[in-house]
Amino acid sequence: MKYIGRFWGWILLGINLCMVVLLLVCAYSPYIDPVAHPVWSCAGLAFPAFLIVNLLFLVFWLVIYRKYALLSFLGLVCSIGAIRTYFPVNVFVSDVPEGAIKFLSYNTMAFEKNRANTKDNPNPVLEYLRNSNADIICLQEYIVGGRLTKKEVDYALRDYPYKNYHKISGANGLGCYSRFPILSAHPVKYASLNNGSIAYKIKVNGDTLLVVNNHLESNKLTEKDKEVYREMMKDPDKQKVSQGSRLLIGKLAEASAIRAVQADSIARLVAGYKGGGIIVCGDFNDSPISYTHRVVGEGLNDAFVESGNGFGISYNQNHFYFRIDNILLSKNLKSYRCTVDNTIKSSDHYPIWCYVAEK
């Protein structure tokens, strides 16, 4: 304390206490109902910022006055579940067992905005999928027309004998390509203008697997909204941040409330399934620290948390760097080597894949 003086020490400790409280609010925000409290439910988006601040306070107090480091340390310990979810570390990599299947989920951004697929210039999304060696592929923003037709997509993925395409609204759709028989495909009932979920039953090695492919409610941010956010990041003056924050938080909160109802519907479907294994995947349009992720993942394991490493950022544009694409597995299934694959840049999302085997 002698290095900074007693007065400033108490001031910094008070600020530290506020940062710990805010960290805990963010860490436990998935338990806040977005319908009742839409703004507060978005607190999880700020989790990494308050995590970094508390880590800095921890280091600072360890150097200046170790006794006060206990405050941030306790805050971090109480947030360990959220930290593990947001930034998993899996040092020991298990070998993929024989008989495991490779599962892949990808928001294709309309196959790179309906880029043509020709012999001399193949569509990079289709090339990636064709060479992925995945056994089951779930696609979001399956939008065709103009330069790329569904027939061409099916031909490019002709190694998959079983396929299903479902148009959600307008041109937007969801698709599934599988090496295993797709027994049925039904929409999950919930309100949405342009998004949706499809539940497939797939026969895999004698067992019936429930696969739920999701594209949950988007945040409806226009290009103007995204430009406001980019300007805030480039030049964060007080007026820009104040005006921009109100605009963005309002839209995020509104979308969060809609997704909450959708998440509840998916959770009911999963809870009522009495068959074999369950895989819930797709674009959740929400961070790992959210009501959506918690409710949809109730009773399931997050494949990336179980066998991935790092942030796993799957949305890659407009400075909104979050892991919003997921693969969740029932307790009788285990994931291996879950990867958010940033080697392909053809969409505003990166694909996420993992190997899946029975325990």
Language-model features, listed with the residues they occupy:
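N-terminal, active-site-proximal structural segment of metallo-dependent hydrolase catalytic domains
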Residues: 1-155, 171, 263-264, 358-359
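Metal-dependent phosphoester-hydrolase catalytic domains
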Residues: 8-23, 28-40, 44-61, 70-73, ...
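Structured beta-strand-rich core segments of catalytic domains in phosphoester-bond hydrolases
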Residues: 77-98, 123-126, 130, 136-231, ...
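A fold-wide structural signal in alpha/beta-hydrolase
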Residues: 102, 210-212, 353-355
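Hydrophobic/aromatic beta-strand patches that form the interior of the parallel beta-sheet core
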Residues: 104, 164, 212, 279-281
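Acidic/histidine-rich helix-loop elements
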Residues: 105-122, 144, 220-255
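Active-site metal-binding loops of divalent metal-dependent hydrolases
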Residues: 106-108, 142, 216, 283-284, ...
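Active-site environment of divalent metal-dependent phosphoester hydrolases
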Residues: 110-115, 144-148, 169-173, 194, ...
